[in-house]
C-alpha cells in the first residue's frame, strides 16, 4: 500500500535529490514502489531596487514528501540516495496520516495557485529604516503599496511626527515591540 513519508535531505540539495530519486526510479524499475515525489514550494514575489522578481521558495527547506510502498528494498534505495539524511521517524519510518496528507496537499495547492508577497508589512506595524537619509530611524507604517513594493512610514524627528514616503520594502525591516532602541 502506498503511503506518504517525509524524507530529510541536505539543505540546498532538495532539487538535486528529487531529480536523482525520479531518474533512478525510472531507470531501476522502482516505479512500482515509488509513486510520487514532492518538493513543497511556493512562488514568492520579491522587490529589490524597484524590480519585481518571482522566485521559488521551499516551504520546508531540507524535506521532500515521497509517496511510496515501503519495503526493505524501497527504503534502502531512498536512504542510499546521495543527499538523503533520513526518513522522518529515524530507524522506523513513520507514514503521514491521511488527515495530515490531505491538509498538506490542500495547503500546497493553495500556495501554488498564486504568488505570495515576501514582505507582509501592515499599516501600524513598527519598522526600522536601514537605508537612505533616515537610516536607523524607527517608525510606524502608515501606508503599504504591495503592487509597487513600497511603503510610507511615520517617524518622530525632534518630537514631531514626520512622514517618510516612497521607501522600498528592502529599505526597512520589521521590528518587534520592545526592540525600538536597538
UniProtKB/Swiss-Prot annotation:
One of its GO terms (cellular component) is cytosol. One of its GO terms (biological process) is regulation of DNA-templated transcription elongation. Participates in transcription elongation, termination and antitermination. This is Transcription termination/antitermination protein NusG. Belongs to the NusG family. It comes from the Bacteria. Keywords: Transcription, Transcription antitermination, Transcription regulation, Transcription termination. The keyword Transcription regulation applies. It comes from Chlamydia muridarum (strain MoPn / Nigg). Pfam families: NusG. CDD domains: KOW_NusG (cd06091), NGN_Bact_1 (cd09891).
Amino acid at each position: 500500500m502506498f503511503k506518504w513519508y517525509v524524507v530529510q535531505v541536505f539543505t540546498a540539495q532538495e532539487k538535486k535529490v528529487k531529480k536523482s530519486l525520479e531518474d533512478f526510479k525510472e531507470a531501476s524499475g522502482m516505479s512500482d514502489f515509488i509513486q510520487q515525489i514532492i518538493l513543497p514550494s511556493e512562488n514568492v514575489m520579491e522587490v529589490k531596487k524597484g524590480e519585481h522578481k518571482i522566485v521559488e521558495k521551499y516551504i520546508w527547506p531540507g524535506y521532500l514528501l515521497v509517496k511510496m510502498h515501503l519495503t526493505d528494498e524501497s527504503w534502502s534505495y531512498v536512504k542510499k540516495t546521495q543527499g538523503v539524511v533520513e526518513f522522518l521517524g529515524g530507524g522506523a519510518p513513520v507514514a503521514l496520516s491521511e488527515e495530515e496528507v490531505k491538509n498538506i496537499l490542500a495547503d500546497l495547492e493553495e500556495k501554488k495557485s498564486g504568488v505570495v508577497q515576501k514582505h507582509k508589512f501592515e499599516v501600524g506595524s513598527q519598522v526600522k529604516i536601514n537605508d537612505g537619509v533616515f537610516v536607523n530611524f524607527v517608525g510606524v507604517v502608515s501606508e503599504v503599496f504591495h503592487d509597487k513594493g513600497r511603503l510610507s512610514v511615520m517617524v518622530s524627528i525632534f518630537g514631531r511626527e514626520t512622514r517618510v514616503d516612497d521607501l522600498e520594502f528592502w529599505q526597512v525591516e520589521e521590528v518587534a515591540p520592545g526592540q525600538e532602541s536597538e
